[in-house]
Amino acid sequence: IEREQERVKEAKENIKRVGVEDKIHIYEGDAVEILPTLNEKYDAIFIDAAKGKYPFFLKESLRMIQPDGIIFADNILYKGYVMSDYNKHKQRTAVRNLREYIKQVSENPNLETKILEVGDGLAVSRIKN
């Protein structure tokens, strides 16, 4: 799901170039609006969107992921703010919701989660069978 038209175009070109257009579908629009309308099951879901919406994206991802599927959440440490006490007012909501995401994936007995401290952080959650 991508809302920026230029990125949609680039993604479609890349998908076609590697010959997987029959396996990948790009939805153009706002993920908050599109996700609730999807009923398919997916092997993998990659979240890289509005940081303040990560708990919502997790809820929707858990609904759509296959058993043994993997959910990736990019930028989970958000410039180091998630792991520090200091948060600029501008980032408070995003940081609070990223912390909530980490709490949810860490405490969910149906998930095995690792937080990778590479770049801006990546959460990798595998659905247990």
Each model region followed by its residue ranges:
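S-adenosylmethionine/decaboxylated-SAM
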Residues: 1-129
